[in-house]
Amino acid sequence: MNELLLQGLSELGLDVSRAETLERFSSLLLEKNEVMNLTAITEPDAVAQLHLLDSAALLPFVDLTGKTVVDVGTGAGFPGMPLRILKDDFDLTLLDSLGKRVNWLQEVCDELQLKRVACVHARAEEFAMQHREQFDIATSRAVAQLSILSELCLPLIKVGGQFIAMKSVDTEDEIAAAKSAIKTLGGHIVKVEDYTIPTSDVVHRLVIVQKVSPTPRAYPRAFAKIKKAPL
């Protein structure tokens, strides 16, 4: 058993009995990474810290119980998969635009017998048009600039729900530049919280956005327009 993982879960006050399943997920990730580009982090201790514990560090800041959660641009399943392994009392949608990643995530969910998970192959802006304001919480980690990410995520969230962006700490300018977009899309930044990944000295940042009003029907735009002219 990975000692860093056990220590980190303990520091976060989380159920250490889930460490075995998290470690199995890590093994499946590194095994598949040999034939598919899933992660540049390939050392087990680094995976434990920079993927598993980084994702788990979200839990003290948000109550997922009974919620509908969408992980936008989930990639290899972060933060969504560790959140699901650690907590099984919410509904999770893992959303990614690359079909082979989504297929692999479904295989992992089956292998680990994870319930209440939907693995969806779709572009976020197209998915948002079909599932407008249907989720309580949207998460996203290191996917895009916050102004772009807000247009992909906020349309998915119900009024009263939250969008949580996981960022690096050097994002003051990025956050300031995104405030107008967030307001236009019906959101309001309620907290910017820095946290240290357990067992490491790496500091990351959460940007927590509350959905305070419906997103105008004009959004999200086609991704080419979002990228060319961010709000």
Model feature map: region roles:
Residues 101-103, 171, 175:
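Short alpha-helix immediately C-terminal to the canonical SAM-binding loop
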Residues 87, 157-159:
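Helix-to-beta-strand junctions that scaffold the AdoMet/dcAdoMet cofactor pocket
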Residues 9, 33, 108-109, 179-182:
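Conserved hydrophobic residues forming the short capping helix/wall of the S-adenosyl-L-methionine
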Residues 56-142, 150-151:
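Conserved SAM/SAH cofactor-binding pocket of Class I
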Residues 160-170:
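Conserved beta-strand signature within the Rossmann-like core of class I S-adenosyl-L-methionine
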Residues 176-231:
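SAM/dcSAM-binding transferase cores
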Residues 31, 35, 47-66:
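Conserved alpha-helix/loop element of class I SAM-dependent methyltransferases that forms part
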Residues 1-38:
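N-terminal auxiliary segments of SAM/dcSAM-dependent transferases
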